[in-house]
Structure formats: C-alpha cells, structure tokens
Amino acid sequence: CTIAQLDLEMLLDGTMDLLDGVITPTICDTLRPMSQNFRVAMGDKMKVIFLAHPQNRFEEFGLQFCIDQYNHVKADLEEIAGRKITDSDIQDAIVVYNKSRAARREFVKLANEHCDVITPTKRSAVLKAFYFMEKPEYTAKLNELNAELAKLPVCDWKGTKVVTSGIICDNPKLLSIFEENNIAIAADDVAHETRSFRVDAPEDELDPVRALAKQFANIDYEVLLYDPESNKNRRGEFVANMVKESGAQGLVLFMQQFC
C-alpha cells in the first residue's frame, strides 16, 4: 500500500521528526506486518505504540480485549505526555468528538443539498481540515458554515450526482475532474470521510475507555471489520441504498494500490 509506504518513508527521512510518537493499528493486511517495520525503524527515535483491534468485537470478550488494548495505548500516551490521563479527560474528549461528528454528519447532508456551492474539492477540504485543527475550533467553524448553508435554497442540480467509496479520495486534481464534468458528490462511504464519523461514542458509560470500545464495536457495514452476516451482502445493500437515498446516479469506487 502506497499510503503506508509513504508514511514510513516520511518517518525515515525526518519529515515527521516533530512527532513524539506514532500509533500503528493492525486493521488491514498491510499494517499488520508493517507495524513491526515502524517499530524497528523508529523505535529509537520516538514512541511506537502498537494497537490491535479485535475483529470479534461484539461479545463481552471482544469488548474487554479492546479495553485492554486502549489501556495499553493510554499508558504509552501518559508516558509521552508526562502526566496521567484521567477518566474526566477522556469523557471530555468524547463529548468534544461527538459534537464534531454531529457537525460533520450535518455538513455532508447539506453539501448534497447545496452541491452548486460545495464542490467536490471544497467538500473534501472541509472534511480533511478536521485532521489538522483543534477540534473545538473546527466544530465551531463548521457549525457556522452549516448555518449559512441551511439558509440557502436547495440546489436544483442539473448535472450528475455520485456516491464515492473507498479508503481515501482527497486528491484535488482528481476531484477537479468531477467538477469539470459537472459531477457532484451526493454522499460518501469513504473511510477517511463519512465512515470515520458515522458512529458516536456513548456519553453515559461510567468507564470512558469502555465507551470507546463500545463505539468501535458499534461500527457496522465496514469492509475492514468482521461481519458475521457477510454472506447476506449487508454492506453491498447498505451502499446501494445510500446511492438511492442520496439521489445519486451511480457509485465511484476508489481502490488503493494493493488494498
């Protein structure tokens, strides 16, 4: 996978020297062995934190495994930060991130209604900004944008609408081709976009780490995660229904190399 390869190259050439640590999940076939490459290559330079999510995540033993993994990550992050991460810290973070998820879910709905204003490149830029901004500031600005979009009349789009699906689709030059051909993005099933904020973490759980594990367990229709009913084509039907319900005329699937 070129994404994972580029990450390792940027770590090795010093591009990411400002980082104090890196978390390496094992959610796909590339990351499982490559997590050890990260550890061997960067272990003397920064903290390399191994994270193995459970695939059997629905049962109590799966939840407990996930909790144990998150607590290992928490301990490593405490070592980096030089202080304890309290339950209150995690509870506060859950609230902050849930508000951000809600704002982004509202944005993608409004983007479909106002695709004359929110072009594919602008839609991607707004969602991608989440990864680079402090979350309260990002959410506040996005709520302002959502409020302005809600004031506009719903667009009578004369072009084509599609749903995008895949791991990532944020290349501005590629997205500009959509615009040149009068194609709008009605909705997405992209891991880097909507799939990352589809499910909230419970705010009423006494143990906040368990709340995070429950959030992971509640993620569904995810190609990277185990589905005990995959023989029923649940994910395929889910994406097909997304196309129908969003008013799109088709689906564009972005495949990563070797993914």
Please tell me what each predicted stretch does:
Residues 67, 71, 75-203:
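A charged, amphipathic alpha-helical module
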Residues 1-88, 189-192, 197-259:
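Trp/Phe/Arg-rich N-terminal binding region typifying the photolyase-homology
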